[in-house]
């Protein structure tokens, strides 16, 4: 043999064992004689190495990769020693064996990995043990497949492998045929339900499903399970068809198909259990929704009934307000006539006095209307105090349209009067006309009294609530009117006092009027309080002689001081006769003794008791401050006594550690 042929044969054998290069499969290798000794071959290799070192060839892009000289020295003798038995066989046979070993082993590993990943993608927790056991079985079957493949291999050419793949595609095994049938059965069941193959396959699947679907009564779950099963069988058939193209052995494919069928059965079981568990849950949810819907319907019906009841209550309150406003409609007609005479009344003060008298007469009628409105309010306040008060106000506004027109005219008259005279004359005329128009809005007045007339008007409300009090006040008011008529002719020049009289009738008017009048009323009340204290000073001296007890004296004096503040007309009665004033005051004070008094009076009583002096009105709160100075030394005396006393033991919250020495000294 020539040297290049021997080198080529050795190099090709070396490449097959080391790198598994496919480039040199095309070269036809001829058998060489085994009679060549190793020493001659080694000499020839050395000569070749010398030539490669001295005359290096330029590396061509398409040329074969050459071995290093050190690798050639080491590997060639070893190869000859190992494969003495294999060299007896023809070269193409053992090359095919080596190639088959290398190319078949990774394909089987890939099949196992793909199937393992597809088998349990949905049950990592429940079927983990089964998956591990099946992997162990697959490993055993892989080793068996390798042994079978070694036995079945025979003498063939190198280029027969792609031919086998084509044959496997053209004439597949029974397992691949079954997978194709399952695919055809799907398409035929959807398109051609009359085909025999689809009927046979569907009957088999239905039988398997009926065995496991004894507990499930509804057919919807079976239809879903068949669909899912058909999808799983499709995936299994696809995976198996891929393995057919890669594997040449039919035995391994049959084993994999059997495993896939067993897994599909388990998958059906799991699907049915899952569907049954899910089918129970929505029924509960639907029941809850139905219950909620019924409850919401019942609540809506109840809310509608409650709304109807509220509307009925508001209608009743409106009817009660109508009755109250009927008495005020007659007065609203008189108020229009009074408005026409506004401009003429500015010049003549005698007409003002007559209108004040008429307004006082009308105020007596308005108080009767107040009583009726309060009775209707007590029933309405139980449900909603604020809402019913607003509704009563709205109902009175809607029904007394004439009174609203009267208000607008009165506002216009006020603006004209402010331009002409911004002083007290404008206030008199506005208050006298507003008193007449204000009678038609008793519901508004009563609803807004408690909010803005806090402490001053509580006593009036309590007095009006009782019938006996109202009668006693009615007698007192009649005496007031008689005294007022006599004094109006004497005091026409005084402009402040008629304003005070007109304010008595307009104390319970609307809010925007009361805000303007408050500032003037405070100044007038201070003046009246001073005069009342002068008269009360004389009364207190007489009462101190008659009554020895201080408690009764303070109660009567405080009640009288309140009346002097709220009712400035009382000072005039005192000037006339002390006996009549004391009798009228006692009648009003007796029912009020049982009623709670404001907090300011109680604190003032305590100060008065300590001082021991007579009654002091709230306008003179500053003078009682100096007597508080003798009270100061009493705590100083106590402090001196505390200094003389020994120090108290330490409190438990400030107690230090028990190891401290000063604690033992104190103890």
Curated annotation (Swiss-Prot):
Keyword Cytoplasm: yes
Biased composition (Pro residues): 624-633
Composition bias type Low complexity, residue spans: 173-182, 223-237
One Pfam family recorded for the sequence: Cylicin_N
Listed Polar residues bias regions: 238-251
Annotated region (9 X approximate tandem repeats), positions in chain: 287-569
Keyword Cell division among UniProt keywords: no
GO cellular component: acrosomal matrix; cytoskeletal calyx; sperm head
InterPro entries tied to this protein: CYLC (IPR026189), Cylicin_N (IPR029354)
Region (Disordered): 121-251, 275-634
Sequence repeat residues: 287-305, 306-337, 338-368, 369-405, 406-442, 443-475, 476-516, 517-547, 548-569
Complexes and interactors: Interacts with proteins of spermatozoa head including ACTL7A, CCIN, FAM209A and SPACA1; the interactions may be necessary for proper acrosome attachment to the nuclear envelope.
Record protein name field: Cylicin-1
Native species: Bos taurus (Bovine)
Gene transcribed to yield this protein: CYLC1
